[in-house]
C-alpha cells in the first residue's frame, strides 16, 4: 500500500502550448489504474462479484503492466485479500470505480515527460440524467492519481469522461455527438468550442464525430463502447447485421461516417467490424442483488450495452470482455486478426457490464512517455 505524495502542481498553461499531447493507447505504458468497486446501489452483493472480476482483470493486465488500484480507506484490508499481490493499493476515496472517466488523461512531450489533464466530472449528467449523487469524491480522483506519479496537472474547463474520447496519437480524436453534445454535459458550449478545448488539451486537430453510441449505454453513448482506433488509419466498430435490432441504425450511421472521412494525416480509414454479443439482458437474480440508493436502479429484463469494442490495449496485450459463449470465440478470433502482434486475453466480464460499463471503462492507462 502506498501513501500520497505532495499534491500535483496545477499548471496555468495548456498542453498544446507546452508541446504535450495524448498518446494513443498502444503507446508504451508504465501503469494502468483501476478503482475498487463497492457501491451497493450499483454493484450486486455490495460489489462482491465485481471485486472478484476486477481482480481477474488486474491479473490479466498485471502480466504486462503494473496495476495501481484506488481504494477507500475502509476497504483497504478487504482489497488486500481479494486483489493479486502485484497490485499496488493506494488510498483514494471515490464515489464509484470508473477509472476511465474519473482518472486523468496523461499527456506526454517529445522528451518523454508526463503531465496529466484533470477534466470536470458530473457523474454522466449531473442533475440532468446523471447516474448517482453526490460525485464530489470522484472529482478529486484524477488529482490523487497524478500526485501518486508526481505529475503536474492541467485543470481543463470542460466536463468530460475519458470514455468519451479516443485518439490515434497522430492528431485525430474520435467521439460521439450523443455524449459530448448532450445538454447534460457542457450546455453552454458549442461543438466548435468543445473542439477548440479538446485541441488545446489533447493536442489534436481533426475530429471524427459519430452520431450515437451503443443502444442503452447509460453514459449517453461513450465512444469507447462503440468504436476505437486499432492503429493509425484503422478502427474497430461494434456491429450487428440484424437490421431489426435497435443497435443497427446506430452502428450503420457510424460506419457511413467512418467510410467517408479521413484522419488528421489525410488517410482514409480501414473499418474492422466486431459483432455484438447477445443481445444480453439483466436477470431477476442480478437485479435483486442491487440495493436501493441514489444510483440508477437495475431492472430485470433491461437490455445491457454489451460490446467487445470495450477492451484495453496495454503494452503487448489486448484485454477484452467475455460476455456471451455464442460470440466470445468469434470476437477473440476477430481481435487476433486485427491485432496479429498482440496477445489476446479474454476475461469473464458480465459483472462489470451489470454495473454499466466494461474493461476499458474501469481502467486508465498511464503512458511511459520515455
From Swiss-Prot:
What keywords are assigned to this protein?
Hydrolase
Gene Ontology MF terms: agmatine deiminase activity; protein-arginine deiminase activity
EC number, UniProt record: 3.5.3.12
Q: Which residues form the active site?
A: 361
Q: What class of enzyme is it?
A: hydrolase
Reactions catalysed: agmatine + H2O = N-carbamoylputrescine + NH4(+)
Q: Where is the composition biased (Polar residues)?
A: 1-19
Q: Which family does it belong to?
A: Belongs to the agmatine deiminase family.
The identity of this protein, by name, is Putative agmatine deiminase
Organism of origin is Shewanella frigidimarina (strain NCIMB 400)
Amino acid at each position: 500500500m502506498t501513501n500520497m505524495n505532495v499534491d500535483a502542481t496545477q499548471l496555468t498553461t495548456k498542453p498544446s502550448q507546452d508541446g504535450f499531447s495524448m498518446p494513443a493507447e498502444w503507446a508504451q505504458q508504465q501503469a494502468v489504474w483501476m478503482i475498487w468497486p463497492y457501491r451497493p446501489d450499483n454493484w450486486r452483493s455490495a460489489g462482491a462479484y465485481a471485486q472478484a472480476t476486477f481482480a481477474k482483470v488486474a491479473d490479466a493486465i498485471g502480466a504486462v503492466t503494473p496495476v495501481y488500484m484506488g481504494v477507500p480507506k475502509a476497504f483497504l484490508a478487504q482489497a488486500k485479500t481479494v486483489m493479486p499481490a502485484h497490485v499496488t493499493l493506494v488510498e483514494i476515496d471515490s464515489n464509484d470505480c470508473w477509472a476511465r472517466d474519473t482518472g486523468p488523461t496523461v499527456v506526454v512531450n517529445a522528451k518523454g515527460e508526463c503531465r496529466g489533464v484533470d477534466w470536470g466530472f458530473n457523474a454522466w449528467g449531473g442533475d440532468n440524467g446523471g447516474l448517482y449523487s453526490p460525485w464530489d469524491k470522484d472529482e478529486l480522483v484524477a488529482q490523487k492519481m497524478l500526485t501518486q506519479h508526481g505529475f503536474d496537472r492541467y485543470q481543463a474547463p470542460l466536463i468530460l469522461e475519458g470514455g468519451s474520447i479516443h485518439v490515434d496519437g497522430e492528431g485525430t480524436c474520435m467521439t460521439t455527438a450523443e455524449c459530448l453534445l448532450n445538454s447534460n454535459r457542457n450546455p453552454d458550449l458549442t461543438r466548435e468550442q468543445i473542439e477548440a478545448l479538446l485541441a488545446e488539451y489533447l493536442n489534436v486537430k481533426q475530429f471524427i464525430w459519430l452520431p450515437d453510441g451503443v443502444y442503452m449505454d447509460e453514459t449517453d453513448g461513450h465512444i469507447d463502447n462503440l468504436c476505437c482506433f486499432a492503429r493509425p488509419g484503422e478502427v474497430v466498430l461494434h456491429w450487428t447485421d440484424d437490421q431489426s435490432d435497435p443497435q443497427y441504425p446506430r452502428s450503420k450511421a457510424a460506419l457511413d461516417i467512418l467510410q467517408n472521412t479521413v484522419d488528421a494525416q489525410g488517410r482514409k480509414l480501414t473499418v474492422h467490424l466486431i459483432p455484438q454479443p447477445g443481445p444480453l439482458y439483466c436477470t431477476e437474480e442480478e437485479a435483486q442483488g442491487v440495493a436501493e440508493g441514489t444510483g440508477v436502479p437495475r431492472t430485470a429484463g433491461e437490455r445491457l450495452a454489451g460490446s467487445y469494442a470495450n477492451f484495453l490495449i496495454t503494452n503487448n496485450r489486448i484485454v477484452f470482455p467475455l460476455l456471451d459463449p455464442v460470440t466470445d470465440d468469434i470476437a477473440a478470433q476477430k481481435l487476433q486478426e486485427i491485432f496479429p502482434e498482440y496477445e489476446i486475453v479474454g476475461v469473464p466480464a458480465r459483472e462489470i457490464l451489470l454495473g454499466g460499463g466494461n474493461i476499458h471503462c474501469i481502467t486508465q492507462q498511464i503512458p511511459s512517455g520515455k
